[in-house]
């Protein structure tokens, strides 16, 4: 409110997020050196907070064990939406309008793979508008479903025609992949590597992006990719063990992080 008096406490969330980012990463004033700042609601009455933010207050209290009515909240912008998406096609009729029922509608460049809603690219700009995700989900969902039925009806083969060896080969691939992961006996902790990657991306490729920092980030991601080869699979048991799957996902995260950067 001091920096943007015309907005009062109604400053847009993207502006507020950039200010929090500046406090944490440029001014180095995050709480205890961590990426978080205080949101003080203690001056508001408990009835007011329960009425306006009841659900959020309850969730925060369960996760932190602290009551925002008495102790300032610790907050930081969270990633919950990825701008951009898969390229998708469409077919126009003679009037230039969408030809409903066409198998090309919302089809990606991979035959048989369709994308709609937040997974495709068409409704994204420099900043996300809250209702656009719902709009795109409804519109592309309605348009895509009829096209999928048309695509399936026009297929020459069904899943029953696929050789069983195809599934056997896929199963063998993943069995060998996880066997390889379980055999990783290096020095790097995968969970620490994941944290390091997250810190780099949050600091340089989240809210504020600068070319120089992006170039530095690519170098750091390449370094993490090198460190990945020296991972230690800290749990090699077969039953109810999420570690090998996490390590496999971490590899994909590293690749995706570089693409995004």
Residue ranges and their predicted role:
Residues 80, 102-112, 133-140, 189, ...:
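Secondary-structure capping and boundary motifs in well-ordered enzyme cores
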Residues 100-127:
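Short FAD-binding loop at a beta-strand-to-alpha-helix junction that anchors the flavin cofactor
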Residues 1-67, 71-74, 147-153:
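An anion/pyrophosphate-binding glycine-rich loop and adjacent beta-alpha core
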Residues 227-260:
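C-terminal amphipathic alpha-helical interaction region
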Residues 47-108:
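Accessory "access/gating" subregions that flank catalytic or transport cores
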Residues 151-239:
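Long, amphipathic alpha-helical stalk/connector segments used for oligomerization, subunit docking
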Residues 122-148:
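A conserved FAD-binding loop/helix module that cradles the flavin
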């Amino acid at each position: 409110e001091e920096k943007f008096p015309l907005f009062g406490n109604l400053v847009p969330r993207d502006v507020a997020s950039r200010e929090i980012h500046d406090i944490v990463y440029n001014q180095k004033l995050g709480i205890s050196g961590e990426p978080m700042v205080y949101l003080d609601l203690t001056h508001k009455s408990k009835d007011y907070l329960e009425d306006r933010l009841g659900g959020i207050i309850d969730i925060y209290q369960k996760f932190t064990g602290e009551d925002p009515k008495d102790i300032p909240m610790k907050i930081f912008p969270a990633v919950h939406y990825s701008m951009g998406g898969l390229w998708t096609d469409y077919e126009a009729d003679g009037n230039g309008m969408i030809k409903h029922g066409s198998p090309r509608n919302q089809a990606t460049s991979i035959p048989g793979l369709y994308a709609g809603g937040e997974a495709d690219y068409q409704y994204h700009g420099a900043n996300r508008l809250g209702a656009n995700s719902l709009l795109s989900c409804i519109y592309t969902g309605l348009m895509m479903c009829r096209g999928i039925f048309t695509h399936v009806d026009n297929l020459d083969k069904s899943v029953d025609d696929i050789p069983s060896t195809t599934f056997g080969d896929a199963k063998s691939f993943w069995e060998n992949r996880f066997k390889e992961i379980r055999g990783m006996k290096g020095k790097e902790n995968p969970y620490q590597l994941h944290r390091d990657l997250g810190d780099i991306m949050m600091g340089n490729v989240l809210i504020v992006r600068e070319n120089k920092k992006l170039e530095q980030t690519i170098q750091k991601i390449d370094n993490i990719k090198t460190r990945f080869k020296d991972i230690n699979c800290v749990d090699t048991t077969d039953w109810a063990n999420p570690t090998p799957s996490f390590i496999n996902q971490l590899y994909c995260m590293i690749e995706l992080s570089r693409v995004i950067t």
